[in-house]
Amino acid sequence: TASDYYATSEYMNNLPIKDFGIIDENLRKRIVSSFVNNENKPYNKNLIEKTENFINIPFEELEEKSNKNLNLLRQKLASETIQNLRNHYDQNLFYLEAPTGAGKTNISIAFATELLKFDKSLSKIFYVFPFTTLVDQTFQSIKDSIDINDDELIQLHSKAGFPSNKTQEGEYGSNYKNYIDYLFVNYPITLLTHIRFFDILKGNSKEANYLL
């Protein structure tokens, strides 16, 4: 179905689609490098390069309540997560549970960059959330953490639909290429809600089935 849509689009609109939003080697290196070398978040570089140091900090030294110890606890949690990935990178399922404020969003971004380093077969990243507010928050966190362009990151939920109206001919004018990318999720990193995720897996609408 998808290939037929692409072929029809190219024939009717003279619009061949050649970029499917795949994470190639250049983008992979840019994501990893920008996360580690982000001047606004120097703790990411420490996390990746000094993982063992944070893991070896005894919990007894972090019992006193202070911002410093809170940040060290976050780094310790993140370091243990990264270390587990490095030891079991051939696994397909990981589970992270931590209280609010523990830095799970930053850990997830660090985890994704490490996965990209270990597994060259990974070509896309999907974040699935229960609430649209979490999509919005994580979208901004990703933009603040890595060097990613607007056409490489997308939000898919009911409050972030394709921002254009169809013309009388049923096309999107100069935005038609953007519409195709949105329809087929031609983006390296996609953030979506549970509703959209399960709609893709179990829905029977034409547009939902394009992604299967």
Regions found by a protein language model. Name each.
Residues F54-E97:
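Conserved pre-motif I regulatory segment
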